Structure formats: structure tokens, C-alpha cells
UniProtKB/Swiss-Prot annotation:
Taxon lineage: Bacteria, Bacillati, Bacillota, Bacilli, Bacillales
Protein name according to UniProt: Putative phosphoesterase BCG9842_B4061
Enzyme active site: H34, H115
Family that this chain belongs to: Belongs to the 2H phosphoesterase superfamily. YjcG family.
GO molecular function (one): hydrolase activity, acting on ester bonds
Provenance organism: Bacillus cereus (strain G9842)
Top-level taxonomic group: Bacteria
UniProt cross-references to InterPro entries, sorted A to Z: 2H_phosphoesterase_YjcG-like, Cyclic_Pdiesterase, YjcG
Record-linked NCBIfam families: PRK13679.1
């Protein structure tokens, strides 16, 4: 089974991202806008309970925090992904580090850059044009974060929530 671990921002932030994703992200229909804590990984069904238990432990060790989302960035020239930048807080860093050690042994493909994807798979010309236009706009949002989610991928490629983990001691 394929799993991923994400934070979903507020509906307002998701709506803003989806307004752009409809046009610029071919994965728009597969998963709502999110901040990836751990990229998708394969696991055996019998490992799921251990993963869930580990995520409850990680959530209990992490305090709720404020998510700051703003400005548009890009991963070019590595790939033509456009995103809303997410401020890297100590809590986000801790969550990401905890999800890449211990039970989670998958190698990182990229350094952790918290972000909210708004476009991908664009040609170089389209990427440059859209990035130029979006960088002139003013985006800034913040919201409290008190949970993250374990997702699994369905046969049709869409992602759905398996379990939600509340941050802070006594919340799980």
C-alpha cells in the first residue's frame, strides 16, 4: 500500500491554491492542497498498525503551531513546480525529521522545503510566464495547525485520509 503524511491547510488557503491548481496542476483531482511531511512511500499492510502507533507518538511530542504561507516560489531548474512558500518552523522541521528516522527508513529524495504546490508539469515557457505573473501578486496567510494526516492511495490514484493525528500531549 502507498502512504503519505501531510498537513491540510484551512479551506480558505485550499480554495486559493485550488484556484491556481485547476489550471496549472494535473494532480488537482487526486489530492487536496497540502504540505507534505513525508513523501509517498510503499509499505506492507501488516506494518500499518506500527506506523499509526509511531505517528501518535510523534504527534504527542509536537506542540500545535502557526502555519505561515506566502509568496510564490519554484523548484526550477530542477523541476517546473510552482508553490506557495511555507515558513519552516521548528515544529515542521521536527515533524519531518521524526518521519525520516526510526520506523521510517525511506531515503529522502530532496531536502525538506515546506510548500503548497500550485502548479507542476508545465513547459519551461509556461512555467516562466506563470511564475512571473504570480510573483507580482501578494499572498500571505497564517493559521493554527493542530493536526496532521496519514493518507493512503486508492487504485484510481486519488488519496484519502486513513487517520488524523492531533498535536500535543494528551490529544491522541
Amino acid at each position: 500500500m502507498k502512504l503519505g503524511i501531510v498537513i491540510f491547510p484551512s479551506k480558505m488557503i485550499q480554495d486559493k491554491a485550488n484556484g491556481l491548481r485547476k489550471r496549472y496542476d494535473p494532480h488537482y483531482a487526486l489530492v487536496p492542497p497540502h504540505i507534505t511531511l513525508k513523501t509517498p512511500f510503499e509499505t506492507q499492510d501488516e506494518q500499518l498498525e506500527s506506523i499509526v502507533n509511531e505517528l501518535h507518538t510523534i504527534a504527542g511530542k509536537t506542540n500545535p503551531f502557526t502555519l505561515h504561507v506566502g509568496k510564490v516560489g519554484s523548484f526550477a531548474p530542477v523541476n517546473n513546480v510552482l508553490y506557495f512558500k511555507v515558513e519552516k518552523t521548528p515544529e515542521l522541521t521536527f515533524l519531518n525529521e521524526e518521519m525520516h528516522g526510526g520506523l521510517f527508513t525511506q531515503e529522502r529524495e530532496y531536502a525538506f522545503v515546506p510548500h503548497l504546490t500550485i502548479g507542476q508539469g508545465l513547459s519551461d515557457a509556461e512555467h516562466a510566464d506563470v511564475l512571473g505573473r504570480l510573483r507580482m501578486k501578494d499572498f500571505y496567510y497564517e493559521q493554527p495547525i493542530d493536526r496532521f494526516h496519514l493518507l493512503y492511495q486508492l487504485e484510481n490514484g486519488t488519496w484519502t485520509v486513513h487517520e488524523t493525528f492531533h498535536l500535543g500531549k494528551g490529544n491522541n
